[in-house]
Amino acid sequence: MKILKFCMLLSLPTAMACGGNTPKEVLTVRVDNEFTSLYMPDSCGVTSADGTISILLDDGSSLFMTGDCFVGNVVDGKRKPGEKMINNSLVHIGSDYRYLGSHYVGTPADPSSLCTPPEAATSSCAYWYWPGHGFQHGDILYCFMTKFYQGGEGQWGFVFDGTDIVQIDLKDYSVKSTEEIYDGKCPIHWGHCVMKADSYYYIYGTRYGTRTGAEYDPAPLYVSRTKFDETSGNLGAYEYFDGRGWSSDPAAAAACGGLDISVSEQFSVFKYDDTYILLTQRRAQQAGDIYSFISDTPAGPWRNKRLLYITPEQNADPDLFTYNAMAHPQFINKEQELLICYNVNSYDLQKPFMDVNTYRPVFLRVPMDMILK
């Protein structure tokens, strides 16, 4: 891929072993070219997208939630001008690293988003969903979807209008139900990470920060928790971390401690053995630095900040930017390398048609020891 020739490696400094002069192994982050090519083929599926948020299914395979995406064929790294873009889809990858297809409404010649807010049918404004995160329970995929409408001018004139849970039937990928759980007045964008631990589902979100120049100050991390209610077939009452314990009052939600960077809109929290790991890209314009933190509890405090990687695209081309790094721990390999990714996009809306790699995610392999030690 064209963009891959710019990729950089971040290494931990070589250290001398105690009592000797044998250097320890240098740990490096590398681009996973094979997974990058597997995830985004040139035909027969979604061929350009952002989002790239994975949900592990009960059978060991994974569904990746995409945001805005294209399904048209790619020829010589290009796509036809004016090809239709849809706002969400699912990409299915097997545990054995096989591409199992993609899911959206319609046909490759005339595709539509897999799910659409009910408001789209009645509002004079354009409404759409971008993905949060989700989980499987039985034959249903429960997806937190962030709802937006076009409330301003230009490509950045979108407005957040709440968070819905969309139930998708895994037998045929039809939408079974839609329920609004937070309206547009909610200051926290809940549902951008879901982690199951013990009997709880931990639901994470960030409070959208005020932008000052290129920085967002702040964009802290919040967490709630709930259990699945078998009677209703949905999540039960939520509790919110208030800085000391758990409260039923959403207004009592307090930011998790230990973080000194603005957390990106989309991020990952997962459990590895007895350790909780947060992976996030710093939220700032043209920021490419990807960090990890660890904690002993799902709510922090977070510690052990590690700069894992700096994306090169925004420095190689001022029209490009990268964002929303995500972790996919179900694909940790035998070398104990975590699979992560970040999204690439362009301020020039024509570039993704002329070079599809300017609107495709890049996958990386990160040694777990870089995060844990």
Where would I find each of the regions flagged by the language model?
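C-terminal motif of bacterial Sec signal peptides marking the signal peptidase cleavage site
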Residues: 16-17
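Beta-rich carbohydrate-recognition and catalytic domains
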Residues: 21-45, 57-127, 136-185, 202-262, ...
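Long, low-complexity, proline- and polar/charged-enriched segments
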Residues: 190-198, 205, 209
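Sec-dependent signal peptide recognition
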Residues: 2-9
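Surface-exposed substrate-engagement region within the catalytic domains
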Residues: 308-311, 321-322, 328
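Beta-propeller and closely related beta-sheet repeat lectin domains
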Residues: 50-53, 111-119, 123-135, 190-194, ...
